[in-house]
């Protein structure tokens, strides 16, 4: 599904943990809609556009946030990121590489990438985060709960 900027202090997945047959909160998983970003696990973009933007910024975001950064750079060029319910897939977050919060070098890399993301997008985060996310919903949890 889509990615919400500001969720958890940086960015997080909408509807994380919802069953595959769920229509989501307010039927959002069953409706095509714009998001500031979508997960790189199921990201489709023209190769020419990908190349024109320089692809994923692996120098600053080797593992985490590279997809979100790319989508935000797309938005800055006037494009939109659309989540469609008409393509289905299951995203097993970090299944192959393990969690970023497991400690050690992996967690240090994640924290550094998170800090770079927060610094690069500080103005957007300071303005309340995602323009596609209702400001009456919390940014603390991935559950569309009210503030």
Residues covered by each model-derived region:
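Conserved donor NDP-sugar-binding/catalytic core segment of glycosyltransferases
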Residues: 1-10, 60
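A short, conserved alpha-helix in the catalytic core of glycosyltransferases
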Residues: 29-54, 59-88
